[in-house]
């Protein structure tokens, strides 16, 4: 499954293992920026290797605030 901007992903490795995130930007073929609206707000995304992410097949459409993102991702955690 391909990871693109707006994809909902689950972290497979690291201290955030098992948490749901939304991809905010694809930097290159190996790294993306992810956020969850709480520990990683939209203003301060985390850089993550795509090898450590599992795609869920769901995409986020036009979420602009951290609160909206937290509510949307609550179903995945």
Question: Where are the predicted features?
Answer:
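Ferredoxin-like alpha/beta domains used as RNA- or RNAP-binding modules
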Residues: 1-5, 12-13, 22-77
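Short N-terminal binding/cap micro-motifs at the start of the first secondary-structure element
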Residues: 17-19
């Amino acid at each position: 499954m391909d990871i693109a901007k707006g994809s909902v992903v689950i972290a497979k490795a690291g201290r955030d293992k098992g948490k749901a995130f939304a991809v905010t930007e694809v930097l290159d073929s190996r790294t993306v920026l992810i956020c969850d609206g709480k520990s990683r707000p939209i203003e301060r995304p985390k850089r993550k290797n795509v090898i450590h992410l599992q795609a869920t097949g769901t995409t986020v459409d036009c979420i602009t605030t951290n609160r909206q993102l937290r509510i949307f991702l609550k179903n995945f955690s």
